[in-house]
C-alpha cells in the first residue's frame, strides 16, 4: 500500500456536494429522512457539450421520494447553483443534472497536479485491504509462449493498479508441478539426457515435449549423473529428472517474465500441498466433510455437454450446488488420487489462511467453465468471508502485416514470449496487450506495433511524453531558469499564471488531467487496467491536438518569445500532461521516454 495519496479528486468533491444538497433537501422534508445516497454518481457527461459533469441523483432518488425525477432534479439543481464551484446547472432529459464548473476549478486542478507530482492520482480507495493477484501460473513444462503473454501483462498491470489505488497487493504464481504433465516433462528430459550422452535419439516420440529448450536440461542431468541415471529404475530416476526439469523450466520462465518487467512475490508449489507429513488437500476435504459439504454419492448422467471428470460410479463429491454451481464436483479419481479441483480448493484455502479475503485469479479463455466451481469452493472453505474475482483473458492472434505468424523452431509448436519481446520490445507488448479489454480477442500485429503513427497507440502515448520534454528543452530560451529535474521543474512552475489558460484546447487538456484520479479509482474497483491505457490515449490525443493548434495558430504556441508569463503557464500545463502520462505508463509497466529514437 502506498504511503501517501492525493486529496479527494474533483469528481469526489462534487459527489460530496451533491450528497450535501440531498441531505439539505431531506432536512427540509423534500426528501425522506435517511434516504440512501449510495447509488448517486457524478461522472463526465457522454456529450462534452452538456457540461463538465453530470449526476443521476434525481433519477435514483425519485422513486423513494415519491416524486417525478425531473421535478426533483429542479430542486437539486436550484441548490447546486449556489455552489461556489458551479458556473451553470441544467436539467436534461428525464431528470439528469448537467454541471458546468467555474474556470478557477481547472486552474486549481492543474496546481494540484503540479503539487502532487508522481503522487497525483494515488488513491486510498483500497484502504490497505490485502489482495492476492495470481497470474501466469503456466505449467513449468517449457518457455512462455505468446498465449501466456496477455495474462502475464494483465495480471501485472492489475497488481500495479491496485497498489496505486491503496491496496496491499501480493503477486503470486501457482506452480503446477504435481500433475501428469511434469512426469511427461521428466521423461522428455531423460530422452535429452541420452542425447547429451551421445545416443542418437531420432525423432521425438509422440507424447513427449519436442522443443530444443529441453536440451540444456538433458545436458545438466548428463553432467551431474553421467550414465548412472539411465541405469536407474523409473521410480528412482523420475523424481530426479522431474525436480531438475521443473527447476530449470521455472528459471527459464522467470527470465521470460523479467524480459517483460514482470515479477511475483510468491511462487506457490502445488506439490507443497501434499509434501511431507501434512496433506493439505486431505485436510481440506476433511474440513468440508465436517461441514456437510463433502459426501459419497453418484452423479446423474450429464445432459447435453459432458461434465468434466464425470464417472458413473460412487465417488467423493463436493456439494458445489449448495454454493451456486450447476453440479456437485468429484474430489477423488477412481485410482484414489486427487482431482485437480481438489488441489485447487486446498490452494485457495491457503490464500484465505494467509489473510487474503480478496482474491483475483487471471485465467485463460479455456478456463471459463471452471469459475463457478472454484467460487463455490471458496464460499465453502471461507464461510462466505472470502471473495474470488476471475478475470478471463482471451486469445491473442499473432500477425505480421495482417498474416498469421509461423511457429517457433526452438519451442517446437508455438511462438515464444521472448521472441515477441526481442522483436518489438517490452513496451509495445505491454501497452498493446492492455489496449483492449481482457475478455475480447486481441489481434497483435508485429509490424503495426512499431509504426510511428497515431494508429499505433503505444507510440502515440510515449510520443506525447517525449514531445512534452522537447517543449521544455526549447523553452529555456524564453524561461532560462526552467529546471531540468522533474520535481524541481514542477515546483518552479507552481506559481505560473495558469488562469490565463482559457483556449478551448487548453481547457480540454485541463479537464482530461482532472479526470485521472477518477479513472484510477474506477479502474481499480472494476479490476480493469485497460481503462488506464484508454485514458492515456485520450490524454495524449488532447495534448497532441493542443500542440497542433499552436502550430496552426502562433499565438497559441507553448512558447511565446515576448510573453514569459503565458509561456510559463503553458509550460505548467505541459508539465501536468507529462507527469500524468508518466504516472499512467508506470502503472502499466511501460517506460515514459524523454526522447523518441
Curated annotation (Swiss-Prot):
Under SUPFAM superfamilies, the record lists: Anticodon-binding domain of a subclass of class I aminoacyl-tRNA synthetases (SSF47323), Arginyl-tRNA synthetase (ArgRS), N-terminal 'additional' domain (SSF55190), Nucleotidylyl transferase (SSF52374)
Q: Which GO terms describe its molecular function?
A: arginine-tRNA ligase activity; ATP binding
Q: Which Pfam families match?
A: Arg_tRNA_synt_N (PF03485), DALR_1 (PF05746), tRNA-synt_1d (PF00750)
Q: What is its main location?
A: cytoplasm
User: Which GO terms fall under biological process for this protein?
Assistant: arginyl-tRNA aminoacylation
What InterPro entries does this protein's entry cite? Answer: aa-tRNA-synth_I_CS (IPR001412), Arg-tRNA-ligase (IPR001278), Arg-tRNA-synth_N (IPR005148), Arg-tRNA-synth_N_sf (IPR036695), ArgRS_core (IPR035684), DALR_anticod-bd (IPR008909), Rossmann-like_a/b/a_fold (IPR014729), tRNAsynth_Ia_anticodon-bd (IPR009080)
The GO cellular component terms are: cytoplasm
The entry's localization annotation reads: Cytoplasm
Q: Source organism's superkingdom?
A: Bacteria
- E.C. number: 6.1.1.19
Q: Which residues form a coiled coil?
A: none
Q: Can the keyword Nucleotide-binding be found in this entry's annotation?
A: yes
Q: Does the keyword Cell cycle apply?
A: no
Catalysed reactions listed for this entry:
tRNA(Arg) + L-arginine + ATP = L-arginyl-tRNA(Arg) + AMP + diphosphate
Q: Where is this motif: 'HIGH' region?
A: 138-148
Keywords from the named record? Aminoacyl-tRNA synthetase, ATP-binding, Cytoplasm, Ligase, Nucleotide-binding, Protein biosynthesis
Q: How does it assemble?
A: Monomer.
Q: Which family does it belong to?
A: Belongs to the class-I aminoacyl-tRNA synthetase family.
Query: Mind telling me what this protein is named?
Result: Arginine--tRNA ligase
Native source species: Rhodopseudomonas palustris (strain BisB18)
